[in-house]
Amino acid sequence: MKKYLTLVNKENQIKNNYLKNLKLVDTKLADNTPCQLEEITYQNYLLLKKELASKKIDISLASTYRTVEDQQAIWEEYKEKYGLEYVKKYVAIPKTSEHHTGLAIDLALKVNGKYTWDNDELLQQEDIFKKIHKILPEYGFILRYPKGKEEITGYQYEAWHIRYVGKIPAKIMYENHWTLEEYITKFSGILYVNKEVGKTSFDIVNEISNIFGIQKVGHTGTLDPLAEGVLIVTLGKAVKVAELITAEDKEYIAGILLGVETDTLDITGNVIKSKPVDISKDLEQVVNSYKKTYMQEVPVFSAIKVNGKKLYEYARENKPVELPKKEVTIKEIKLLSSDNDTFVIKTKVTKGCYIRSLIRDIGRSLGTYATMTALTRTKQGKIDIKDTNTLEEIKQGKYKLHKIEEVLDLPVIEVNKTLEKKIKNGQKLLNTYHICLLYTSPSPRDSTSS
């Protein structure tokens, strides 16, 4: 999907590696001249053409993929015909044309029984083009050079020039009246994702990045492949506030098997210790006793660094290492159910708590071993699992992109223009607002992992 957001304009030349990976299909222009289009773009163009035909609007292709050499020839032709000032205004310099992407189309329109691609004639068909523009997002297209955006795009309004970007980005751009340039710089927000079992948090981030076609995507607390539930994903400028969201308390429901301990402290690992389960202590009482603050030993399979090396690297190399301990607080913990050698707990913990380690410690307090069999993050801060969307729902456009301010729920301080300028320039300010700044050193992205 990211390739569909490739920006090519007067300031951004087409990259050679993009051209190497371009998959084109053969087709024909309105005058039967052979041409090519990127394969997904062509498929969606055909669907658009079919939809418009049902509305008695007949479109065809006037211009599609162009090589750099093609664009050079066009530049020279129009320069000779109309002069240098004209081509500077209306014709792209070679390597800066959208047509190099294979994603751009200049439409021809059937008027009075014949196709026309003459710009002056097309400009007289504004009413028809308005109908075309309205349904473009349904097929992943945008009007690339809209009215009133000339200073941003660098080109005059072209009703006939459309560009494939993918359905979700196209819908967002249409609703916000954004150009591609504006989408790339302005699109940001926070998604509440319901992560499924089997995927890593990185898998989710990568898929979200592909869906929206943007590079800046992060998350606020790793969930292991075994785990599911609330994963908060930040996009664009929202990536900068990820650490603030990570600091919020998290709520989990965990399944536990007694009598077994694995190297990973969950059921996916190799069994390293086992013993018959013979619990003489009261299970609920022991579980409740963990509502406290204590020094928790982190799992060896984690991204915590010791001497500049991640713990899981020591584990994979089978090298001994002293496991660090960190202070964590179990704010709430409750036994939900139990059956012989298994039980389920619900707990609310502070940042940095490993549920796998908590389960190991409960097992030891019971005089046996324990390993995690399932984990669901049901809440992070005020964000509940019922407010999340699955990846499949997001792909279908069924999601809400939350604003940074509504997620952080921080107080608003109004400032005057002078102070606003100082803040934007990064100047030091007197703390006249009595703001308490809490600083915690950055921790690995999966420090809140299960």
Task: Give each language-model segment a name.
Residues 207-214, 232, 321-367:
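The conserved catalytic core of RNA pseudouridine synthases
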Residues 139-140, 291-292, 364-371:
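A common structural junction motif
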Residues 244-295:
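Acidic, low-complexity central loop/insert segments
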Residues 185-198, 202-223, 227-230, 281, ...:
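Accessory RNA 3′-end/elbow-binding domains used by RNA modification enzymes
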Residues 1-64, 68-186:
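Extracytoplasmic cell-surface/polysaccharide-interacting catalytic and binding patches
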Residues 73-79, 230-239, 245-248:
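Glycine-rich loop at the start of a catalytic domain that most often binds anionic cofactors/ligands
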Residues 301-302, 306-331:
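Extended alpha-helical targeting/anchoring segments
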Residues 233, 254, 308, 358, ...:
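Residue-level signal for inorganic ion chemistry
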